[in-house]
Swiss-Prot record:
InterPro entries: rRNA_ssu_MeTfrase_G (IPR003682), SAM-dependent_MTases_sf (IPR029063)
Localisation per UniProt entry: Cytoplasm
Chief place where the protein resides: cytoplasm
Species of the source: Sinorhizobium fredii (strain NBRC 101917 / NGR234)
Family: Belongs to the methyltransferase superfamily. RNA methyltransferase RsmG family.
Protein name: Ribosomal RNA small subunit methyltransferase G
Listed PANTHER family: S-ADENOSYL-L-METHIONINE-DEPENDENT METHYLTRANSFERASES SUPERFAMILY PROTEIN
Reaction catalyzed: guanosine(527) in 16S rRNA + S-adenosyl-L-methionine = N(7)-methylguanosine(527) in 16S rRNA + S-adenosyl-L-homocysteine
Listed Pfam families: GidB (PF02527)
Binding site for S-adenosyl-L-methionine: G72, F77, V125, E126, R141
Keyword Glycoprotein: no
Keyword line: Cytoplasm, Methyltransferase, rRNA processing, S-adenosyl-L-methionine, Transferase
Amino acid sequence: MNASPAERMKALRVSRETLDKLEHFAGLFQKWAKSINLVAPSTLEDLWQRHFVDSLQVFRLSPFPKTWVDLGSGGGFPGVITAICLSEHADGWVHLVESNNKKAAFLRVALNETGARGSVHPIRVEQAPSVIPRCEAISARALADLTQLLDYSAPWMLADGSNTIAFFHKGRDYQQEVDKAVSRFQFDLVKHASVVEQDSVVLEIANLSRRTKC
């Protein structure tokens, strides 16, 4: 997205303050990406569309939950983008879970320098529920297949009184993953067409339960 700040602000539908933070994050990302592998190098030339817009669509799908968990945060998509957007909401917070120490260090710098509302947990995804007891939304991008993601998310989504919603980016083969997942779980599913890549989707999942074995 080679555009002026005004054009970007209009296209992304964000405030000038949020755009400033997104642009600062973009600069940090490009600097750090020279030394550590944050995303596929082939996507760096289209950073805004492939990663920023792709991440922003998740935030727009949500009913503005206060507490997010982003699993396998990697280069910060969608976790840091969500945290930046939540900067305008005083009670919002994003927990970024990333076990790679170099990537976790980058995420800390990104949060600190942009003033985004979040914290970094340099732990394995499986350990996250014991550190983060509750959340209202879960996100993950390019982390695992849907069944594994639901296993990771189950401690939050199956908790008594939970209304946690999950948002997972998936490619064109998403239906195969859904078909596999329904053999173990029941859930409400909404498929949102990706605004970035044809045939890709964001899966919105709620009311998760495990199927009872016969």
